[in-house]
Each structure stands twice: as C-alpha cells, then as structure tokens.
Amino acid sequence: MRAVTQRSFGGPDVLELTETDRPRPHLNEVLVRVRAAGVNPIDAHVRSGAIPLLGEPPFVVGWDVAGTVEEIASGVTRFAVGDEVFGMPLMPRAAGGYADYVTAPSRQLASKPAALDHPHAAALPLAGLTAWQALVDAAGVGAGRRVLVHAGGGGVGHLAIQIAKARGAEVLTTASAAKADFVRTLGADEVIDYRTTDFADAARDVDVVLDTVGGDTALRSLDVLRPDGTLVTVVEMHNATLARKAADRGLRCLGVTAEPDPVGLTALADLVDTGALRVHLAHTLPLSDAAQAHRLIDSGTTMGKVVLTT
C-alpha cells in the first residue's frame, strides 16, 4: 500500500510517498480502507519535530481518517465489513493516517455521518473533538452563555462557533476581515477583526473563552471573562503562569487535548445530520501532495480544513 513517510524532521519536503506493507488488525481492531485523511496543525508540528509525539522518524503521520471497514478482527461487534466509519484513532500514539489503510480499535471510531462524503468526514474528528471536548465536556457551554472563540475561521474555530450556537450560546469570535463573512455564515453573533481591534476592549462579560492561539492572546483573554468565567485553552495546556494568574482572579483555566471519543464523534455526527454543523474544506489534495498540504497548514491562512484523498 501507499503511505506518506518521513525519515527525518524538517519542512514539508521531508514527506514522501512510499510503498509499505498493509497492516493487519489485531484483537478488537478493524482494518479501514482510507478514503480521506485530515491534515491538522499537530501533524505539521510532529513533522517538524516541534512536538515529537511519535519519537524519532521514520514514521507515518496523521490521525484523522474516514473510509470503509475492509476487515474485522475477533472481538469487534460494532462494525461489519463495508461499514463507512470515521475517527481519530490512537491519538497521541501513531495512527499512520496518511496511508491507503490503517488499523484502529473499533471503539475509537464511529459511523460516518450520512450527510458527509469521506473528505468532509475526515476533516471533522480532531478539530471537532477538540472543540466539543473544550466547550461541552470541559466548559459545559449551554443556553444563555456568552462565548468568545479565538480564530473562528480556522479548523477548530469554525466548528466551535457552530457547536456553541447549537447549544444556545451567544458567540463572539476573532477573525481577519477576509474571514468575517465566513464566520458570520457559521452563526457568529459578533466578529472582532483582531488586526484592527483589540479583542480585550471589544469583548466583555464573557462566560467562556476558547483559546486556539496561545501566547499573549491566552493571557489577555483573562481580561474579558466574568468573575466566575472559564478560559479553555487547546494550546497552553501546561502554562503554569497562565493557570496561576487565572486562579488569582478567581477564574478557571482548563487545558484540553483531544482524545479518541466515540461518544463525542457520535454527537458531532448527529449535529451534522441535523444540519447544525457543517465542515468547510479549504483544500482537498491527493495523498501524493502531502507536502503541499503541509505548506498550506504552515501558512496559517487556510479557512477551514485541509484534506488528503487516496
């Protein structure tokens, strides 16, 4: 089978299409014929060595997949051969998503939403679970809450806006002028152009901030929260200074790293199938163009998600 392998850390050009053996499913696992694989910022960080989750190369990066069950091992009861599935298996261990086939624990996958084709389904798991686990599981966002989503035009942000709206929240978001119309179509009630306006002046009395940017943005987000507000960060999980400053103000600071979650995947699928959640693809490229997909991710300018198809 084909797989995108890297033999060293570095820029996008370290990614190369190779031939390798097809994996075999073990107890409680399924073999998935991958039809599409999502490309995420974490993939680029692993590729560069900035976040060495997978140790030293060689390895095949990628977690988001959508495809068809081709083989099941003993112990699998949730799926049958031919079922269409999607998920983010094994995170943070190696899943090898940039390939024609992957094996995955059956309980880390869910049935693909009927309303989505494989590329759109592959774009959903990591970004969608990050948003869901941050807003719903960690912060308990619900009706009447006032939520600020940073970088609303990005992969996580554009899904977070819709999830918060589906749960009855008022949503503010930061975005560039070029993405303002896009985030409004997702349901954002107020758009703050971070290039011309200080969000700390424009946003006040916020119940929950979802930080997808980190650094000074995370720290200054404390200024916009109500006295009992919550900052959920998906990039500053181990920032002791941020946590201490939040505690000093009586605020909650929660760090969230997405983990495989079939319940969350099913909840996301339900939102998709009811029309409350749509996945925006910025670029769809063939597996052989993985390096170009990473260049797009590294640019930081994509609106929505980047996906590889097999």
Locations of regions flagged by a protein language model:
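C-terminal hydrophobic helical "lid"/dimerization subdomain
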Residues: 1, 265-310
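Glycine-rich beta-strand-centered segment in the early N-terminal region that forms part
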Residues: 21-38, 50-91
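NAD(P)H dinucleotide-binding glycine-rich loop of Rossmann-like/cofactor-binding domains
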Residues: 78, 88-151
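Short glycine-centered segments of the SAM/dcSAM-binding site in methyltransferase folds
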Residues: 84, 146, 170, 229-230, ...
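N-terminal Rossmann-like NAD(P) cofactor-binding module of classical short-chain dehydrogenase/reductase
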Residues: 86, 209-210, 232
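Mid-domain Rossmann-like dinucleotide-binding core that forms the NAD(H)/NADP(H) cofactor-binding site
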Residues: 121-193
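A short acidic, Gly/Pro-enriched loop at the edge of an enzyme's catalytic core
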Residues: 201-208
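Glycine-rich phosphate-binding loop and adjacent beta-alpha segment
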Residues: 213-277, 310
